Amino acid sequence: MEKLRSGFISIIGRPNVGKSTLMNQLIGKKVAIMSDKPQTTRNRIVGVLNAPKGQAIFLDTPGIHKPKHKLGEIMVTTARKTLGEVDLILYVVDASEEPGGGEQFISQMLKDIKTPVFLVVNKMDTVSREEGLKKISQYSQMVAWQELIPVSAKEKTNLDRLKDLIFAKLPEGPLYYPAGSFTDQPERQLMAEMIREKVLHATREEIPHSVAVIIEHLQETPKGGMVVHATIFTERDSQKGILIGKGGSLLKEVGQKARQEIEALLGTSIYLELWVKVKKDWRQRPDVLRSFGFDEKME
């Protein structure tokens, strides 16, 4: 009988290359929020793939970029810390983009890491075959890789092949998480991220990056439902007004869409109560970052 294989895989790449979409598709569950805004992922998120061959534990890390504020520094530190602690690195690049300074920076960083690297060329569905082959050639010369896999996370193209290669590389060993687990994130964090995702989709410019969501209180109802009290923090009064919208229209839209996903997560009906508050320049304030769950010492 074939022995089980289990291990940890870090998914890295510059912002907006599709890392969260890739992880969600690989495990078949939505554990990381998705947006076309760069730097959507802020913490290291764990997603667990359970398969007959064993268990693959994915760490979806923040996109590696040049930080512009204290939160950005924490995000990049979080991404870099995982690289020497895992069994495998999936370095995700975007087939629709030319390699640039971000890829050069990451490739240089990987030279000092002994962990095996799979180069995953994502978004192959967005380019022609000729252009895709050109990008594969360009990216393949930038980093020492053990496997090179062109995929489309959005269309689920070549993901089964990627899974097979991942399990072939993982060490033999027992399951790290109970069978059936798909993430280590608490429900409160999942709910907060679902709300933040809807804010990202509904806003533009600086507002998406200026928002933090905290679940303040959960209360069960006599009929078995749940009341969820959440606060959306932003940095300026002008942003607060935009987030609320005319007559509360934008906040209502965010709440309606987030409620549907939270109900699917909890398996029960919920009443979602959203508040918007200003916490001036919170991304630059270590005390506020710690209270929001961001910390340089985060694993």
From Swiss-Prot:
S-S bonds: none
Phylogenetic lineage: Bacteria, Bacillati, Bacillota, Clostridia, Eubacteriales
Stretch list, region G5: 151-153
Chain spans, region G2: 39-43
Protein name: GTPase Era
Location(s), subcellular: Cytoplasm; Cell membrane
Primary localization: cytoplasm
Organism, as annotated: Heliobacterium modesticaldum (strain ATCC 51547 / Ice1)
Gene field: era
Binding site for GTP: 13-20, 60-64, 122-125
